[in-house]
């Protein structure tokens, strides 16, 4: 896998620095932001604690019904997965609001920041990790890990096909005919 040039990473840092500058340039604004996020996390913790003792508790936040990543029923029925999901959604919502509500940022920088936040939050979604995705965890346990072995084999094949660069296959190339 080829590393990204440092200039791309520095561009992300510069963009996020402009957003952070707005939020951190005023102590009251920064404190208000921290208080809001802290309250959201404490509310989530309280909801999780009530559920643990058998009480019904309304979720702090729910995924969009169109978000296919969280359709498995265990995202709601299993307290661990439900907590991880809500924590992710609250954090993602906050990150998007930071960009949306930052004042004094030019439209181009805001668009870049929105794009970067979307990419990062999608990358860290609990649905992307074995231990925090109920479907993948179930399949891993049921197949004794064979699903992970197959996935790693396919990853190695994709890297080999790209000669060191990840070249993700989107279909079976043996079925394709030039013509």
Where are these regions (language model features)?
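Amphipathic, low-complexity, repeat-rich surface-exposed segments
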Residues: 1-179
